[in-house]
From Swiss-Prot:
Name the record gives this protein: Vascular endothelial growth factor receptor kdr-like
Gene name of the record: kdrl
PTM per Swiss-Prot/TrEMBL: Phosphorylated and activated by vegfaa and vegfab.
Topology class, membrane: Single-pass type I membrane protein
Region (Disordered): 1159-1179, 1266-1292
GO MF annotation terms: ATP binding; growth factor binding; protein tyrosine kinase activity; vascular endothelial growth factor receptor activity
Entry annotated with the keyword Protease: no
Cellular component GO terms, alphabetical: plasma membrane; receptor complex
Originating organism: Danio rerio (Zebrafish)
Annotated localization: Cell membrane
Amino acid sequence: MTPLKTSVKAFFTLHVLFSCISHGLVEGSRLPDPQLLPDGDTHLQHVGGTLTLICRGSTALHWRLASRNVSSVRIESCEERLHKHCSKLVIHNLRHNDTGIYSCSHKKSSDHEVSTYVFVKDPHHPFVEAYSLPHPLFAYRNDPYFVVPCRTTYPNQNVILETQMNPMADDVKRGVQWDPKKGFTVPLKPYDSYHLITCLTRVDNAEFSSVYLLKRLTMEIKNLAIEPERPRVLVGDTLILNCSAETTYNGRIHFEWEFHKERINRTHHFSTTPVQLAQIMVMSKALIVPNVTMEDKGTYTCTGSIEFKKLQMSTKVIVYEHPFLNVTHNKRKFTSTVEGRRVQFEPRVNAVPAPDRVLWYKDGVAISENSTCYETAGYNLTIKQVRQKDAGIFTIALSNQERGLYRNISYKLEVRVKPKIFEEDVAPAGPQTFRYDQRHKLTCTAFGIPMPNITWFWQPCDPSANLTECKLYTDPLPIENVDDHFPQNPIKDVNSKVGLLKSKNRTISTLVVKTANVSGVYSCTARNELGNRTMRIPFYVDDHPQPFEIEPSTAVAGDDITLTCRGTRYLYDRLTWYDPLGHKVPKDETTLRIEPYTISLSIKLPNVSRNHTLGYECQALKINTNKVVNVTSALTIDERQGPWLMQNLTNQDVNSSSTLTLACLAYGVPAPFITWYKDKTPVTEGPGITLKDDGTLIIERVKKDDEGIYECRASNDGGEAKTSAVITVVGEDGKPNIEVIILVSTGAAATFLWIMLILFIRKLRKPSSADLKTGYLSIIMDPEQMPLDEQCDRLPYDSNKWEFPQDRLRLGKTLGHGAFGKVVEASAFGIDKISTCKTVAVKMLKVGATNNEWRALMSELKILIHIGHHLNVVNLLGACTKRGGPLMIIVEFCKYGNLSNYLRSKRGDFVVYKSQDGKAVRSSSGCDLSELIKRRLESVASTGSSASSGFIEDKSYCDSEEEEEEQEDLYKKVLTLEDLICYSFQVAKGMEFLASRKCIHRDLAARNILLSENNVVKICDFGLARDVYKDPDYVRKGDARLPLKWMAPEAIFDKIYTTQSDVWSFGVLMWEIFSLGASPYPGLHIDEEFCCRLKEGTRMKAPEYSSSEIYQTMLDCWHGEPSQRPTFTELVERLGDLLQASVQQEGKHYIPINTALLTKADPSNQSPTEETSTRPVSLRDSGTAWNIKIRPESVKTFDEVILENGTNKIHEGGQSDSGIGLSSDDLKTLKRLESLARPRSFMSRAMKRKSKESVLLEGEMDKYPPLVPSLSLEDSSLDSEMECHSPPPDYNYVVRYSTPPV
């Protein structure tokens, strides 16, 4: 570059820089004021005319007009002359309200402004703004003046100012100033007030006015607040911040929003809301920010001011990119309180956006917003006065349906209650009497929380002979500590138990008095930590059937009798007699007796007759009520009659040593006295001779000396009657009775022999069934020590616990059948306490079954009882075993059939993870098994025997009618990878339970796993009586086939079945699950070569949908050394960890609430689902590359063996799913028997087990699409119109009468 060019360029740069600086200075503070033409401060125009103003300046110009409502405005450029810029303002057709200031200034600087005031004279509108109604004028308390803005359109217009009601003071009038451009300026004192102010003027004899109202404004401002306090919004939402403050009447607050110290000019809303008129006024200003971005987060400041007084408040706005909904317990989730107190549940909710639906539930029932018992505010639930019925589970369900977010948590409320005694409310009024020398039972039923303890006490009455009232002899003495020195009744038993009464658990204590002989007071005291309650039971012993009565009830005319009024001692007192005329019988004519159990008062009546004995009345004071009671004598007078005989004695011949009985039936008034004579000598009682009250004579072991004439004489005051007979003794006295001796000797010998036989049998036999414990189950399951049928015969069957009436069982369609039995669907009415009618499965024999078959089914029943109840096994519900009717076993009904069929049916609906939009319906297994995952090392159900612990079905899975109606069909839900892990986890739990009961399954496969409601799987065909048949004909029919595909090498080669061989089968079962029901070892002949390869360590490749962790678990189960395989407890731990990892990977939170209850409470409310993962929904590729990738290098698979040998052993004839093989001699007929390949259960369904899948080589995989099409986020939801039908349940878990491998 030349020096010249360089100099030119430098000069040009300096020139440009100088020009810019000069331009900036010109535009800055050094700019000259614009020039406005025509000149002058004011201009007068006339209405309808045209106003023209010209403004010249150095930069672009800007006009500010007097009114925006001008008729027509035109701004145009004009000749610039000396100035660079010129603007002309032209307004045509001027109006009166165009009067005002017109200003011109530079656009970029308003500091330099020129203006002029234009009057537009209009005779019809002398005022620029005229108000016919009072227009408010505002002035603060400390303002020195105020302006009445009645400007005029003509500068010389004469205007008068008037005030009404409150006239102006003279000094104020003198200080008033008039300016046609402003109006009147009026001096103002702090407490001056003018109600109405009027500006008056006249034009051409026409009067014009404008009315104003002065309002004195306050300077008070307080309680400035911003709502919401902690605003949180999502990107794209609208942010609304409301700033409010309080002032008094006539206060005017000015609000101003700032963000990052800049004034905000966004859309806003201004409103005022009076809280209480004339005292407090709340004014507010809302800031609305639509379509929020991340740049809008930060601190927003609101300033509220009245004149010079200001208040300021700031809030921090947080902006999130993604929605979320979380809820936790603010305090404890368990609350224990007492009645009458206030309880509040305050969950901590963290959600953006806020939930659009908040519902509280009490024990699964939605709480109404108008509930009088519960008060809801925001997320909180308040119980003002807790009652006992409020105890239970409270659940808050939060949802944002638009975002697909659902959460809930539960609180448990325990209401502690002071003890209450049930008998106090239902006991009869007044004390009761207790019969002497008899057994009595006293019951005390107490309710309280915590459950109260009951203690019995005793207080005897003072035994002094002259006392008629029970004065307690001692303080209350505990029953177990009563000293022998105190009077007491012998106690047989005192026991307490917890029972259900009126749907509440109550403590029921029973005191059994062996014999009643002492009066006193028993009391039961129920005590818990809140207090105690005592019920007194007066125990008055009585030796008569009635507590208050008159004796006797009959008499003979002419006799002297004694009427006795008798009452129970301590219950009645002050006995008094009244004659038929109502006169009180004097005390000297009565006799009072106080006995241990009665008090009586007697009077003597001589020569009684029917006329004067009627109407005697006894009165007494009932002590407990202090009321007088009476009873009237109902004496019956019988006329005197002589005795007569009903029949005469007859002569008899009596064998020696026999018994002689002579009856003398005589009647009379009074009752005659019977006397016996023998040969005219009175007969008296002695050894072998009995005289009964009714006149019967009994002589035992008659001898020759007893022969003679026996005479019966009946006598009373009316005379005597007699009859006689001759008694002859037949036989010799000294000759023994041979028949008796023979009979006695024979009986004694038979008894002795029977006892010896029983002792001999008991010595030979093993321990009885009563001694069978849990550990003995291994012997039951091991037929080598004792035949299984003999062991089962010794197992107990408790008919009281398990027997179910056949008439309450309604049989339905047949679900499956086998060679000798069948399984039918049935409805059982009242089989449990949860549901009225329950769908069950019934196993029963076919018509014509043999006795051996009956014994086999009975053996299965006993083993089911002994094994016990568990959630993940098919459980026993009852049985019908009564003779004369069919033998039936009632078990749980699993509506979705076996797991193998179900998995195959779901191949088109399998997704790895649920999509984020939540449209795909998710399996509910996660929800139902949340507690299993949480406590995976604990047993889900009782591991004890149901025979000893009782059986109550888990309520979470009961199929009551309401829940059954609301259960959603699993076939309408997609199947996820998490469900497959969950199935494996549940089977491991069930097998862990069976292993703890020392039960070996021996046929663990997907076909023997049933699927029930709520995605619960149950193991069937476990350890039952498979070897009870020894009939060789049955074996020849095919039941000797073995499930080789599932068998461990030691079971195939050495016939050894252990829990570890079940672990091998569990690994094959996992392979079935993660291949969605495919047949194991696809494409292989199950022959001797296969078994040898298996023993050498060749294994299956990974299934299509497994991960490396899952496949490694399978390989661990297939370890060649049984002792190196994991136990089922370890598998539960491992799968539980995988299941938890799956949950955490998807960001889900399992929440313990029954979805059916929510649906029941509110049909519109969907079941709470988990927050879904944002990753895409897709299926794992089904090619071989996936399987090889996750296979350990040290494991050789059958696919590699096939490729090495250069052979393709795909089974073309339909390889058996069950993989059942025969002995080596029978392997030639394998293809012919494939239709029978599966072990035939005793009541299995006739179902073919052929594999319908095509098994391809790895090289051929690319030619065919995968089994399951890939799903995107949009098509992951199911077609609502698709009709899904579940296959019939597979009930092949019934007794399989197949002999074990030998």
